[in-house]
């Protein structure tokens, strides 16, 4: 009888622990989906390499706007928070790759003197800071963006082929 009670306690403990892990994974996935929604809703901020806006990391402006740069800082902070959380609860090769892909367009900002000396990095744990440093030093580059239409510019029609 005592053995059955101990087994039940162990089983209950394992179930509670697994439920907590599942909840953390679900929260991390939702946070990641939110970063993707933010990227979709803010194309100027989501990928500076597309040159949809003029980023000045020294002056801390985007298209001359300090306010837009502040939004960019919050955008990047959201990506970093989601990245740290997802890598903590799901440290898989696939998530590692996905996070690196999302961070790569922000490499110049993340390596900028301003960001490196801002104190922002101190809010992240040592494991994530080490991951970030390694990811940003990776010489592999994200492939160049496709020839995309610029927002607000007239669209050119494709020429007919004979």
Region spans (language model):
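Amphipathic alpha-helical "stem/stalk" segments
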Residues: 14-162
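Alpha-helical transmembrane segments of integral membrane proteins
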Residues: 1-8
């Amino acid at each position: 009888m005592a053995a059955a009670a101990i087994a039940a306690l162990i089983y209950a403990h394992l179930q509670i622990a697994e439920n907590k892990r599942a909840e953390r994974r679900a929260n991390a996935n939702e946070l990641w989906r939110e970063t993707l929604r933010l990227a979709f809703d803010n194309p100027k901020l989501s990928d500076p390499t597309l040159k949809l806006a003029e980023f000045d990391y020294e002056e801390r402006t985007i298209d001359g706007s300090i306010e837009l740069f502040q939004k960019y800082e919050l955008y990047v902070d959201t990506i970093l928070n989601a990245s740290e959380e997802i890598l903590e609860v799901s440290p898989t090769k696939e998530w590692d790759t996905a996070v690196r892909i999302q961070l790569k367009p922000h490499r110049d900002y993340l390596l900028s003197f301003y960001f490196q000396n801002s104190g922002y990095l101190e809010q992240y744990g040592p494991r994530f800071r080490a991951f970030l440093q390694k990811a940003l030093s990776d010489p592999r580059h994200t492939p160049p963006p496709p020839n995309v239409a610029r927002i607000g510019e007239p669209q050119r029609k494709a020429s007919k082929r004979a």
